[in-house]
Curated annotation (Swiss-Prot):
GO cellular component: ribonucleoprotein complex; ribosome
Family assignment from sequence similarity: Belongs to the bacterial ribosomal protein bL9 family.
Species this protein is from: Prochlorococcus marinus (strain NATL2A)
Entry GO MF terms: rRNA binding; structural constituent of ribosome
PANTHER family (UniProt xref): 50S RIBOSOMAL PROTEIN L9 (PTHR21368)
Family annotation (HAMAP family): Ribosomal_bL9 (MF_00503)
Protein name stated in the entry: Large ribosomal subunit protein bL9
């Protein structure tokens, strides 16, 4: 009897691997848990071809997303400066703060493209002036924009 069997995972399993990974597991684990619950498939030449095809499609999608992020990064740097208007006191200190949501809204107005506010990293802004803001567009692509805070 085989000590280990190979299976291809259909979904991410924390202790084993990710969707599409070829892993070796105990025969009982495969027979009693993975295969009946459709979490894995036994390894056959057909299944291996399907996995390779799925990986190729996923790599194409990832490359397209990365290229889109690079294009958007170029667009952001072309625009140059984004302006946020806030209420300011007599001493030049802001009432409230400039939030990630404010920056996302300004970028959306200028580019017509939504950015998740959680992907924006801003320094603490307490007054009017110019600041550098980091935006994560993709796992490998970041953009730095110039943000100007003015009073209205």
């Amino acid at each position: 009897m085989a000590k280990r069997v190979q299976v291809v995972l259909n979904e991410d399993i924390k202790s084993l691997g990710n969707d599409g990974d070829l892993v070796e597991v105990a025969p009982g684990f495969a027979r009693n848990f993975l295969l009946p619950n459709k979490k894995a498939l036994p390894v056959t030449p057909t299944v291996l071809k399907q996995v390779e095809h799925r990986r190729a499609k996923q790599a194409e999608k990832e490359a397209a997303k990365k290229q889109e992020a690079i294009d958007f990064q170029t667009a952001l740097t072309t625009i140059g400066r984004f302006t946020v208007k806030k209420q300011v006191g007599e001493d030049g200190v802001l009432f409230g703060t400039v939030t990630n949501g404010d920056v996302a809204e300004v970028v959306k107005e200028a580019t017509k493209k939504d950015i998740d506010r959680r992907d924006i990293s801003i320094p603490e802004i307490h007054g009017v002036g110019k600041y550098k803001v980091q935006i994560k567009l993709h796992n490998e692509v970041n953009a730095e924009i110039n943000l100007e805070v003015t009073s209205y």
